[in-house]
């Protein structure tokens, strides 16, 4: 069984097809999200509405290990509740211990008791790993270097119509060196089919030297 809180596996996971196929095979999937995501209807048995993080208090721990608590910008819409409150009620209904918190601050203090500005146990130390990189043999095949556009990165910005109209939300393309385009028999502005595992996409070719 899986409980998904604020995640859309078909868009957020490294291997979306593998993730969604695993969810389809699960005995139970509960998806908690502010949005009725069409893909979730294919694998989720239960959809529970929760408030987005902008309408809830909570705490983030960033990559530096810095603790960042925040308040909701506005109150949740209608009877919507923050995710932590929905989890608390589920715990109460199942008769589980440790689900009696009255605020997100109580949750934070229990998870990180006595924490100051930084979370304990987080650092950038490299342990038990060699610091010498092994040089790999040259390969004749191409290596894909991809990025996630800034306005594709989470459920909130993906649904912001104004942000999707910006230059940073342009449709992804395949950018190759002019020599590579010629060697592959492609043309600038033409289409090329890109595959990854069982997934594929038809993308426009651009030159990038």
Roles of regions detected by a PLM:
Residues 1-79, 86-89, 93-97, 105-209:
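A cross-kingdom feature strongest in bacterial/archaeal respiratory oxidoreductases
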Residues 101:
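Nucleotide-sugar-dependent glycosyltransferase catalytic core
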């Amino acid at each position: 069984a899986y409980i998904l809180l604020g995640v859309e596996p078909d868009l957020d996971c490294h291997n979306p097809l593998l993730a969604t196929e695993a969810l389809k095979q699960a005995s139970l999937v509960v998806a908690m999200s502010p949005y009725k995501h069409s893909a979730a209807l294919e694998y989720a048995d239960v959809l529970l509405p929760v408030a987005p993080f902008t309408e809830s208090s909570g705490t983030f721990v960033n990559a530096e290990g810095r603790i960042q608590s925040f308040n909701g910008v506005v109150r949740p819409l209608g009877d919507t509740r923050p995710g932590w409150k929905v989890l608390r009620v589920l715990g109460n209904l199942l008769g589980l211990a440790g689900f009696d918190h009255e605020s997100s601050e109580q949750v934070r203090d229990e998870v990180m008791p006595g924490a100051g500005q930084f979370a304990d146990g987080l650092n950038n130390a490299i342990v038990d790993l060699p610091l010498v990189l092994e040089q790999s043999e040259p390969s004749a095949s191409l290596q894909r270097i991809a990025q996630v556009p800034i306005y594709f990165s989470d459920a909130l910005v993906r649904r912001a119509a104004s942000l999707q109209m910006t230059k940073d939300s342009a449709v992804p393309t395949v950018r190759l060196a002019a020599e590579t385009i010629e060697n592959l028999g492609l043309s600038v502005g033409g289409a090329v089919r890109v595959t990854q595992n069982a997934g594929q996409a038809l993308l426009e070719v651009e030159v990038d030297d």
